[in-house]
Structure formats: C-alpha cells, structure tokens
Amino acid sequence: MTQWIGAITRGHNGGAVLLKDGEIVFAIEEERLTRKKYDGGPLAAMTKFLDYTDKLDYLVVAHTQPLAESSRIDFSGGDIYTGLARKLGLIDRSDSAYMGEYQHRQVIDMSDIHHKLHAACAFYRSGFDSAVALVVDGAGTFIPMNINTGLYNEETMTWECESIFSCGYPDDFKTLYKHQGGNGPYPGTRIDQIPSDREREEGYHELVLDDTAGIVKAYEAVTQYCGFQPIEAGKTMGLSPYGQPCDKFPKIYTDGGGGKWRTADKNFIIPTYPNAAIVNESKFEYLETTDDQSNSRIDKTTLENRRNLAYAVQKESQEEVLKLIFKAVEMTGNKNVVLSGGYALNCVANYYFLDELNKEDIKLYVEPVSNDAGTAIGAAMLQYHQTTKDKKVRSYAETIYEGFEYEYTLNDITDIANRYGASVTDADNKQIVELLTSKNIVTIFQGKSENGPRALGNRSILFDPTYEDGKDFVNKVKRREYFRPFAGSILLEHAHEWFDMKGMEQSPHMMYAMDCQPGVAEKIPSIIHVDGTCRIQTVTKEQNKNYYSLIEEFYKKTNVPIIFNTSFNLAGEPLVETLEDAVRTLYNSEMEYCYLPEFGKLIEMKN
C-alpha cells in the first residue's frame, strides 16, 4: 500500500515536500509560487499535494515553535495548517494535532527538533550509511527557560545555535552537543530544563547555555551593519574578499565558559533574539554609521569598515565552524560529516574546510537545501523512516531538480509569449552558442525547477564567461550590487583541469567557491571573483542532458568547457518557477532571450 507523507516548514523559506513511499515527488518553496522572497506560511505549496494524492497518511510540520504556541485560529483552537489540510480533505476530520499519543497522530508536529530536521535532511541525502551531523543555524527551536511555566517570550527563551548529532539508519539520531543562545541573563538555570522533551530523553554529552549570539547570528549582525537584510548573508560573503585584516576591530568570537567553547563577544555583538544580533556601534565609535545609504554612495571610512568587518566575520566564522567539525568527529569517531543549517550555504567556508578535512581523511557532505526549506525534507524523511524502519541506505543526491513537472504544449508557449509581446522561433544549441558568443544574455527554462537557492541549468541566466566586463554587465542587468560574484557550470570531465577540486570527484550542487588552476582566471574573467575563486557546478549528461549538450556545444566553439550561470531572477525576486514567470522577467528587464531546449524553441523579447 502506497504511503504518502506531506511535510511543510512554516517560517521564512517556507515550503512543502511530498514523499511517495519515501521518495520525493516534489519539494517547493512558497516564494516560488507567491513570488514573495523568503515567503513563509506555505499555504499555496500545501494545496499542491492535491495534484498528486487526495489523502495523506501523515502531515508533518517543521518550524521553530510548536503549533500549539502559534498560528492559532480563533474559536476553533486549532492551527491554520491542520485546518487547511482538513478543508482540502488531505487528513481525516476526526484527527487532531492535539489528540492521542504522538505515534497515533496523523498531524505530526516536529517544530521542537528544528536542528535535528536539518541533520536528517543532510544525512538521508548524503549517501553515507552513518555520519555525524553538524548544524550551524541562526535561531532554531524556541525553548522556554522554565519548562513548567512554558512561557514564550524574549526573557524566558533560548534558541538553538549549533548542534551535533550522530546519525544512523533507519532513524537513529542522537543529540551530542547543543549550543543554546539567548538574550539573558539566566540566573539559577538548571541545564536539564533547557532541551525539548524529546531530546531530553536522549541525554546530552554536552550542552552550552549562554546569553550571546551564535555563529550565524553574529554573521547576521555584520550583514546588517554592512547595509543588508540579516537574511542576506550571501552578500556579506561576496563582499568579504574586498576587505583586509584590521587591527582596530576586536575579535568577533571569544572564549566562553572558561575556554570550554567559543562564542560571539557580547561587548561587540549584542544578541537580540529571535531577530538578528547587532553590532555595538555605540561602544566602538569608529564603527558608527549615520545613515543606511547603499554601498555605492557611503563615505570611504564606512565603506572600508564594512568591507573589513565582512572579511573578519567570514574568516573568523569559518575557523569556528571548522573547530566544531573536528569536535563532531572527536565525539563520535565517525569521519563521515554532513553539514547543514543556514551557514552551510557559505560556499567560501565550505571550500576552506576541505583542505583541513582532507588531511584527516574526513569526508564532507554539504546539504544544498540547507536553508529552512530543508527542514521539511528532513521532517518527511524522518517520519518515513520512523514509521517504516526502512534500513536501505539512500544514494547520494546528485541532482536536486525537485520542483513540479509542467506539461506545456507549443500552444501554451505561444500564448504566454504573445501576452507579453514576445515571439517564438525554432532554435538549437548552435544558435544559442552564437547568441552567447555575441555577448547576449540567454536564459534557459526546462524541466523541474531546482530545489534550494542555486540555479543549476533549469532556471538559469547564461552568459559568455570569457567576456572581460561580463560580471559588471550582468550585475547591472539583474540590478545587483557590484561586488556580487557569479558561478560557472562546467563539464565534469574538464573540472580538474580548470579548478582545484581538493580531491572531490564532482560538485553538482554549486556549494564550493574553488580556486582556479594556474592560467585559468584570465580565460574566464566574468566568473572569477576578486579573490580568484569561482563557485562551480559540475555537469554530466546523466544529471542534465540538455544543459550538458549546450555547454558541450559552447566548448566546441570556444575551447572553454564552462558557461557563466546565475539564477533566473532579478534582484529581490525569487527564482522563476513557471514559464510565465520566465517571460514576465524578460518583459521587466533588459534580457531578450529564453531558450526552451526540450522544445527546440527560443522566446525573444524586443526590449
């Protein structure tokens, strides 16, 4: 009998996942459907369950705060997600998230194990039969200081910052280490009051509680200081190589607990959970800013401070995370490491880890859906393994094209193009390469959308990487900051010739910013960042036949087996999901071409 499990995550990066007998049918973020960046509350995504099944065996909910404490509907006493699932007929009306024993419920609330869900997502997609998971995240599950009163407010709460778990099949996850951060102070706190009910039963090897910002919250504080939104840490990462060491800054991270752990210096970084922490500008007057002007218009001193502080937080944070990786291996003896949580999207840090881990023969898997959307995957897979006890080791997730399978017809393509005043003509790879080498931007739209924040050839903007001013040109068209780097997609068989892969066989998820091999940078200047690195995606014919063939054609003409690749969106917008999203983006920008390789068609917008 087929088992259907639907899972949702409710916070920012909200999304939904559907499993059929343990395999992903689709995984989608709410923002792709609503067109609102970082949208939460995945009500639109939930309705998509009905496209595949009229009934769920389980609806699993992930977040950072239990359903019982949030999202309540007046009068009914229930939550909006259970209510919607009942309204759609996906679950039985007699069921309740608040009735019966945990194992008998149809609605399963896993919001109390946020970090464990990040770990489960990474472990089940790593290909390892056992592993140790490190989760480095902003603010995970909210846990009240006093379990008896259960008060949920900023004075009584702590939040997960960094966690270590041992992982094994079918559902063997043990919490070994956890750093809980908060605003404090916390007088007279008993350690056994802090973990969630489920995790307290497991016991801990080590639990840290303090009133400081965690690794990610400190990074977010610097991100905010640099003029960005706290969730835009990727911009800080891109800005960091423009900075340099600066002796006038204090260290961001310092010893805590008599040197037993490292934490953000609360004199420099002030925690403001559950929001981002803030840089203490009043204590360090030379850091004070007078306005929130863009990085292109602020005074020279502030610009230098932002660049140098970005450099500092990147360097220091990756050193701290590396220490935690070694701590995880030391605690378990397991040299299979999986990394997840928001920090795992830091491709500069991920590459930094490889050098040190290779010396100790430690294998690293970095989960490509490490944002909170990944907790829905973790929740669904954990529920599947808990109910079936399936011990079969899952294979490495080489591809993450996990969106919907749209069934467009030629008439659909023509109708959508006509609505925006665009034309549709026949096209093949040779013609697309001619456009690219003539310094045209060409977008590509095909198949299922990519899961996670990286475009991997199904929803991508493409350009010629050999064009010297390509980075500035495309950043201007996408309306992005000048310092934002771009990625490259390369034929796997040539990857080691062009980049130092640090022993990796492939990099299909674009999770590492790699050093170029000698003499390479000048050949592909558009995708080489100021520090000489490039975030790359390796491509095989088996992973993406159409995209591979296009890169192969580009290689034949240019002797460069790489295409400039960036996400198909404009600044501040989500990745395009539907063909209409794609054509609308052309209409609202200076881009003119969208290639549909499955149909051999090219949509052209005369802008």
Description of each model-found segment:
Residues 4, 9-36, 75, 79-82, ...:
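Flexible beta->alpha loop and helix N-cap segments adjacent to enzyme active/binding sites
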Residues 316, 344-346:
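A general "terminal functional-core" signal
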Residues 14-15, 20-105, 243-312, 324:
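Conserved active-site "lid/cap" helical segment
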Residues 109, 208, 212, 299-319, ...:
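Short acidic-aromatic active-site loops that bind/stabilize oxyanions
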Residues 53-54, 128, 328-333, 438:
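Glycine-rich phosphate-binding loop signature in dinucleotide/nucleotide-binding domains
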Residues 54-67, 333-342, 443:
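Short glycine-rich phosphate-binding loop at a beta-alpha junction
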Residues 103, 330-337, 360-363:
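Short, surface-exposed connector motifs at secondary-structure boundaries
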Residues 311-335:
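Phosphate/ATP-binding catalytic cores across multiple sugar-kinase/actin-like superfamilies
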